[in-house]
């Protein structure tokens, strides 16, 4: 079945793309969540127009993300955490924690854009990649330090 994506769908495409998908996938997943509509002549013309507008918006957003990436790339941040015996943390440092540190420093980012390779459970310095947009991935350094009591 040919569908026009209404929103970006991971592993399928961006909003406005025309895609061929299995009938069941369209009826049971894409249509109920309003992620896509059936492709017919009228919808295709409207989608083509929307895609043009979307590309302009995407280009503006990409330029804005490049500016944010320039400001973020290479920056170093400290986080104070409680530890058990030695250098082991109580719990772990998560993308939510990193997002809150970045927010305090003027960068409001979605936690899903922050990539931590493996859970941070020890003190030390860690490189963290942030996926702002396709091809724009600044790397920050996070210094995990013991909270003084």
From Swiss-Prot:
Mention any Pfam family matching this sequence. Answer: Ribosomal_L9_C
**What SUPFAM superfamilies does this protein's entry cite?**
L9 N-domain-like, Ribosomal protein L9 C-domain
Q: Which family does it belong to?
A: Belongs to the bacterial ribosomal protein bL9 family.
Keyword Acyltransferase listed? The answer is: no
Quick check: keyword Heme in the entry? no
Encoding gene per record: rplI
Return the protein name.
Large ribosomal subunit protein bL9
List the record's Gene Ontology CC terms alphabetically.
ribonucleoprotein complex; ribosome
Give UniProt keywords alphabetically. Ribonucleoprotein, Ribosomal protein, RNA-binding, rRNA-binding
Job of this protein:
Binds to the 23S rRNA.
Record GO biological process: translation
Q: Can you provide one Gene Ontology molecular function annotated for this UniProt record?
A: rRNA binding
* PANTHER family attached to this UniProt entry: 50S RIBOSOMAL PROTEIN L9
């Amino acid at each position: 079945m040919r569908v026009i994506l209404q929103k970006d769908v991971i592993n399928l495409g961006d909003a406005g793309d025309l895609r061929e998908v299995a009938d069941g996938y369209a009826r049971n997943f894409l249509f109920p969540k309003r992620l896509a509509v059936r492709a017919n002549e009228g919808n295709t013309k409207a989608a083509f127009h929307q895609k043009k507008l979307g590309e302009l918006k995407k280009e503006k957003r990409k330029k804005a993300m490049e500016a944010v990436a320039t400001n973020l790339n290479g920056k170093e941040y400290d986080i104070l955490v409680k530890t058990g015996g030695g250098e082991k943390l109580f719990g772990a440092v998560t993308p939510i924690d990193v997002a809150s540190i970045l927010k305090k420093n003027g960068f409001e980012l979605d936690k899903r854009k922050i990539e931590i390779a493996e859970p941070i459970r020890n003190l030390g310095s860690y490189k963290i990649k942030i996926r702002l947009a396709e091809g724009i991935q600044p790397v920050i350094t996070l210094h995990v330090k013991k909270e003084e009591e």
